[in-house]
């Protein structure tokens, strides 16, 4: 059965000559994920939306879907809902760009490989994984995040990541860290443009 909202949206896009084929989904209302999403929307002149499980089906209207979320304990925030509905949304033929925003080194192969594997981004040619450097300011964390983060630093990091990666994440978390950079989006933008050519 066709979704009338989806059909109407496609008709409006055709009438207005709107040929954007990329949407950015941000799983965050503030912070690094949201800022990266805003920059990406500006650079690609594409559509964007905040993460809302009731409206996530809209991604099926786009050829390229960019999902940006914070890395928490090795998992990209709310990505599991996208995977649970992968077939329902008809994402098999779409290019998916999964972006994790975290405190680890995006150039560390062990860190990136672990997150790629842990978040289900392996084994399919249409899924592309990118790590973006994030930021942390302990004084801006809410109480629950402070407790979770404290536990992760004391116990979880060394059980999850390689020693070098865990040490770096802990150091950055304890001293506040701001690695966010618009330039970090370069490889992602290049890949999207390349696949659209």
Segments (PLM) and residue ranges:
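Flexible, glycine-rich phosphate/dinucleotide-binding loops
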Residues: 31, 55-57, 105, 138
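A short, well-structured beta->alpha microelement
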Residues: 45-58
């Amino acid at each position: 059965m066709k979704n009338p909202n989806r059909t109407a949206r496609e008709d409006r896009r055709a009438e207005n000559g709107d040929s954007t084929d990329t949407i950015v989904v941000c799983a965050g209302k503030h912070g690094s994920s949201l800022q990266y999403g805003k920059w990406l929307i500006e650079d690609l002149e594409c559509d964007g939306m905040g993460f809302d499980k009731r409206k996530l089906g809209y991604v099926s209207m786009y050829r390229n879907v960019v999902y940006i979320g914070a890395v928490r304990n090795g998992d990209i925030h709310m990505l599991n809902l996208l995977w649970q509905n992968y077939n329902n949304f008809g994402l098999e033929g779409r290019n998916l760009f999964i972006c994790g925003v975290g405190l680890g080194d995006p150039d560390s192969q062990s860190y990136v490989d672990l997150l790629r594997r842990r978040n289900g981004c392996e084994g399919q040619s249409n899924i592309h994984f990118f790590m973006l450097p994030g930021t942390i300011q302990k004084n801006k964390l809410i109480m629950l995040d402070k407790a979770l983060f404290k536990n992760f630093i004391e116990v979880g990091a060394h059980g999850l990541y390689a020693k070098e990666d865990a040490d770096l994440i802990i150091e950055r978390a304890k001293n506040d860290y701001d690695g966010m950079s618009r330039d970090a989006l370069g490889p992602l933008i290049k890949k999207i443009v390349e696949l659209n050519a």
